[in-house]
Amino acid sequence: MNRDEAPKNKVLRHDADATVENMSARRFDENGQVKYRLVAPFMKHFADDDSSELDSPTLVAYRPDAPPVTISGRHARVTSKGDVVYLWENVVVNRAATPERPAMTGTMPDLIVQPNAGTAFTNSAVEITQEKSWIKGVGMQIDNNTSTFVLQSQVTGLYFSRKATQ
């Protein structure tokens, strides 16, 4: 065997090859506007699969016609091309308020985000609050392109109309 050839049965180790402090990455749309921003105080990169793990990440998705959506969690894993962000532990999704709509906050244990597609989903329990209203369910699909979310099962909630409380 040549010295430069790796043995065929060699198992690649998943060790960090680089670390970054105060990491910030931005992706731009075709018009040069920021589509999303991903920041974290600490990131480890892994050469074996070109993935990264982040501590306390925050992902902010922007649309010109809608308020920003901020997603945070205690941990995240980003795939090699950044197409998928897996967040886990204390995940919070917040849609900023507008003059017409109050802020909306969702909490869940984990969330899989596809930032380029503008979508996310979880199979876990979810709780969403907006002012005094709340809704709970298991499993959720989010489409930031249409500003919609769909809870998949076991849905319960309490809705207070803004008109009724004014």
Question: What does each model-identified segment do?
Answer:
Residues 1-166:
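Mature-chain termini and adjacent capping regions
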